[in-house]
């Protein structure tokens, strides 16, 4: 969607991880049906937001190519040691022109097309700081999905302080703020590739 003068929500693709369970490859650039995983996600995330950011600590030129159709900006962590998704989130919160950031990992090609709208509705209804997706399976088992979230960029300074103190756990930081959980019944929409086996399984779905 075209970016208005004052965008309300920035979309943040988290593609800055180490992918240690995949031999250190750049996970977002791995192919699913001939298309990089990151591009699958961008095609679903970008139409839901007003501006698009890609957190990438490697292969910035390649991500710039993938993000060009969405006018995406490439950003990198402020620290060089791959401290996890919170570092990418902080970089996105500081780079965003919008007051809200919706984040997603780069390896979830079936991302819900209504993800951001549902997170925004819950955030506003509860006057929360963070809205986080939670999947619910057929047995009613709830599984938090902390890297699928909508956050206020005003939390950036607190996040920076926690990272400086050595904190790396996403849900522990969320617990410091008013967080609302948003239930999604379609588990498939949140399937990702943390291993070569899981990437192969995605191709079969």
Residue ranges, per PLM feature:
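Nucleotide and nucleotide-moiety/phosphate-recognizing core
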Residues: 2-167, 172-191, 196-201
